[in-house]
Amino acid sequence: MKKLLTTMTMLLALGQSAMAQFGSCTPSERYEYKDKQTGVTIIGLTDTTKNDRFMYQTDPMWTADGKYLLFRSSSRGDGKEQETVGRDGKKRKYRPTNYFFIDLETYKIIQATDGKEGGVFLGNKSNKFYYNRREEGKWNLYEMDLDSFFADVKTGKCKKQKHYERFIGTFPTEMGRPGGMAINSDDTYAFISVERDGTDEEKERMSKNAFIPESNQPIKIKPVLSGLRKMNLQTGEVTKIADVEFKVGHIQSSRFNPDEIVFCNETGGDAAQRMWYAKADGSVVKPLYKETPLDWVTHETFASRDYVYFNILGFQPRLRKQASGILRINLRNDDVELLGQVEMKADGDQLRGRGFWHCNASRDDKWSAGDTFAGSVWLINNETGMRYHIAAETKMKPDHSHPAFGPDCNTLIFQSGHFTNGKRLNLMMVDLDKVVK
């Protein structure tokens, strides 16, 4: 009988895990290990049986009060496999992505969506969670009250998701087709990138000015007429910021100034001019860091009040004829600084000499971090130039490491396929106070 009860208990636990849903709270998966190559102690936040990812490194991942850390996963929750049809008419199967929070006091994992959400973004001033849904062909934006939600989760009396959310507005179809979004620093507007139809004259100019890559570079993303819009988070009103004649990608908002936007010309590779800066009223739309033909600029991050950090790639022989690595540009005077590149002999054996791929920085501008083509994560002291090898063999599969800093400027996070040989990603955290003494 005792054996039977034990078996039933295990089956019940497995069933509850499989049917995890909105508001469910599961035990901590936290563990620690020491990287064999770097000697750094790394905290694992999720176990190796799931495939979890942080948000893209340009977006905030900590709640405004710093108590919860956001991530996404298609292997958690109870989302069943679904089928969709792409623009090319081809069918594909997928599991819905759900969004989760890690309670940084207990490391318990809380499911915060039910798989119907598209893009998401955390509030900067208050514990709000913004997300859009496609409902009856409409793009609708919602705001979720996280304080109320977390309080109910702790008591075990979580209500349905609609209880915590407020409908903000519907995006008008005549304003374009919404893509990415970012919430500004005072939580008053959502900045939204769009694709649009435009005029024949615009299309002709766009085709004429389209970037022509080197012969060994594929064209991954074709240019498309795009623009920037903003939605008032109180009224839902949508207004135009600007139109551009290239595909807008990686839209970002300053976490300090409510009217500053950074975005990119997204080609899936190199561009004649990748980085762009705009004011929310549309009065300024200009290139940010004017590129030379040998500059392959990528993965810009609006990390601090006055600086945008970015990479100039050096992964091809032709690109190594000038400086490459992590740089930053001062938004107030356009001054540019090269912060560092990894030593070629220390960049692993697999892709030696290819250097940094993605970058980020702490809000106080003291630290920058980058991942490399070889799968290492590095930390740079921007004041001294000192470099610290944090992690090796992240595999950069099934996604890149994408390092990012916490709001305390002493915490570094990244994702890694180290323990699964690149089959699944686990979420990692490093306490920088223990690395730099």
Features from the language model and the residues they span:
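Blade/loop signatures of beta-propeller domains
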Residues: 21-43, 222-226
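Short, conserved, GDST-rich strand-edge loop motifs in beta-rich repeat architectures
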Residues: 22-25, 74-94, 142-146, 192-223, ...
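Multi-bladed beta-propeller domains
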Residues: 33-53, 100-117, 147-176, 231-247, ...
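Blade-loop segments of beta-propeller domains
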Residues: 51, 56-59, 76-134
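Conserved beta-propeller blade repeats
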Residues: 52-70, 114-134, 167-190, 195, ...
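Asp-box/WD-like beta-propeller blade repeats and closely related beta-sheet repeat scaffolds
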Residues: 114-226, 240-243
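Loop/turn-rich, solvent-exposed surfaces of beta-rich toroidal or solenoidal domains
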Residues: 307-327, 335-386
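Blade-level signature of beta-propeller repeat domains, shared across WD40, Kelch, NHL, RCC1
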Residues: 400-437
